[in-house]
Amino acid sequence: MEKLALFDIDYTITRKETLMEFFKYLVSKDIKNIKFLPRALYSGLMYGIKVYDEKRVKECFLKFIENIDEKELAILTKSFYDERLSTILYEDAVNMIKKLKNEGYMVILISASPEFYIKEFYAIKEVDLIIGTKFIFENGKFVRKMSGNNCKGEEKVKRLEKVLKEKNMKEYMDERTED
């Protein structure tokens, strides 16, 4: 029986919330992106008072990369990982990933963060699979629309179950909650 090691990303293997770090990183690369700060604050407020759900808040928030070319976004996310994400990793978490992989575990990172940048965590060679929130690209451009649901809570469980089924694996857990 193959053993699984599941890790969330934000505040589990990173010290900070990665989507905000992505926004801050792009502002540091082009100060003109600061014009999207009011939208970010508004989105957060609407989520905080329960007017927006997580899907809508993410779609609204990501205006700062709307219509960016998919290849350009890939270059940005690679530099984001190299210059920023890799500096906020918990060393203990990375060491645990390496230890568990060495013990024969299949290592999966599963997060509500956008998959278009968390896939850069494959730079940690012990990571076997990354599951995140998927977004749509149309004609090679980012369009701020989520493909399906935000990968959090029950959706995270569904996505994991789908992967396990595809790999012909079984799951056993004592609780079906995740915050």
Regions found by a protein language model. Name each.
Residues 44-49, 58-70, 130, 134:
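Short, compositionally biased "basic patch" segments
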